[in-house]
Amino acid sequence: MILTVTLNTALDLTYGVPALVPHTSHRVGDISERPGGKGLNVARVLSALGHETVVTGFAGGATGAVLRDLLAGLPPRDALVAVTGNTRRTIAVVDASTGDTTQLNEPGPLVTAGEWAAFLTTYRELLGEADAVALCGSLPPGIHVGAYAELVRLARAADVPVLLDTSGEPLRRGIAARPDLIKPNADELAQLTGSREPLRATRDAR
């Protein structure tokens, strides 16, 4: 089983408009919604390729309920942990005249210490079933910046290969815990190392 972790899950909303014009009202045409966040997107692809996949992270409030209803019809197994706050929404507005997309991302729910502890219990249990784990995306409010480093160490202690896909200080601290793989893009790697030369930045990140 492949485990994907999305601490800051999202309900992805996409609105299609004929043309996005500032300072005007728009009539939305096409509307779609789906479970989102990096780890959920990874799980969706892995499931489509035939891999047994489990998703964990946080979901809460009315938005989280919609997200979990949508997950119920998909192959990844839902092992999300409930929180009191509302799961965030990401809103993509697609301009049909240009094909351009404008993205709006909410910050996510405030996760309490008790909710984090409940997640760690679930995570440890799932590691016992996992052949690999992918830790993906941003951290919601309330989660300490070294959270991914903690999760990497737990995976390594369980002898489970771990991939880390995040950015900024959570990535820097996560790398120090020695994940098996990291997946920064060019901007994230430059932010981490101060270099925009890919080979040098990769060496510096190590």
PLM features: residue spans?
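Glycine-rich phosphate/adenosyl-contacting loop at the front of the ribokinase-like
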Residues: 1-56, 65-66
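General beta-strand structural signal in soluble alpha/beta enzymes
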Residues: 5, 79-80, 134-135, 162-166, ...
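Glycine-rich beta-alpha junction loops
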Residues: 7-11, 59-60, 85-87, 188
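Short, charged, surface-exposed secondary-structure boundary motifs
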Residues: 14-15, 114, 191-196
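Aromatic/hydrophobic pocket-lining residues that form π-stacking "cages" and hydrophobic walls in ligand
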Residues: 42-43, 67, 123, 151, ...
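Conserved N-terminal subdomain of the carbohydrate kinase-like
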Residues: 47-131
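Glycine-rich phosphate-binding loops at beta-strand->alpha-helix junctions
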Residues: 138-143
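Conserved phosphate/ATP/ADP-binding segment of small-molecule kinases
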Residues: 146-206
